[in-house]
Amino acid sequence: MKLNIAYPVNGSQKKINIEDKNKVRCFMEKRIGQEVEATTLGDEFKGYVFKITGGNDTEGFPMMQGVGAPTRVRLLLDGRSGCFKPSRDGERKRKSVRGCIVAEDIASLQLIIVKKGDAEIPGLTDVSFPASKGPKRASNIRKLFKLSKDEDVRSFVIRRELPATDKRKAKSKAPKIQRLVTPTTVARRKALRAKKAARHTKASNEAAEYAKLVAQRQQAKAKRSVKVSSKKVVAK
């Protein structure tokens, strides 16, 4: 069985191939989301606790959370179910998936280190891969650096260094800050609100003038009809 182990603290991951089936007995009959002590895998894993996040069987069918079966089943899936990506809105399709219970015909398991053990695992816990990109949203940048709402977040954006190549010089890139509130955006929103209010006032004034004109026309029409009727009475 292949174990894809990830260590989110350091941002590292490693694939380990276990040939002895007796060593992976600790994962049998376990479900996705359960935590398992990995002492039986070897002395280097003593004290480690893994969390099962997924897996695939020998033919590549993925395990699906919420399917309480140790075998393969066929389900009608949509875009919200997982294990299926629709090509258009509302599309559904019947596909084969594995249950969330680990069985002997599982070929690979995805694991996350929840608790670190006594010894270091070479290539996994002794190395660190920092995130290459920082947050883009203004609120997330404030949360990362513990900034107040009055402080400007533009000077705290994490820049990414790009090495020099044959076609370009060394430079740095920064992401465009999303949902950034500046005096320019505040003035723009204020101008839009004022424009909308002026448009509403103009429309209401024009509607009042039109109603007044219609009332005058109706009064004039009523007077003309009264005069015509009086002339007819006199003629008789």
Curated annotation (Swiss-Prot):
The entry's keywords: Cytoplasm, Nucleus, Phosphoprotein, Ribonucleoprotein, Ribosomal protein
Signal peptide per UniProt: none
Pfam families named among the record's database cross-references: Ribosomal_S6e (PF01092)
Main location: cytoplasm
GO biological process: mitotic cytokinesis; ribosomal small subunit biogenesis; sorocarp development; translation
One Gene Ontology CC term in the entry: cell cortex
Quaternary assembly: Component of the small ribosomal subunit. Part of the small subunit (SSU) processome, composed of more than 70 proteins and the RNA chaperone small nucleolar RNA (snoRNA) U3.
Family in the record: Belongs to the eukaryotic ribosomal protein eS6 family.
Name this polypeptide is given: Small ribosomal subunit protein eS6
Organism in which the protein naturally occurs: Dictyostelium discoideum (Social amoeba)
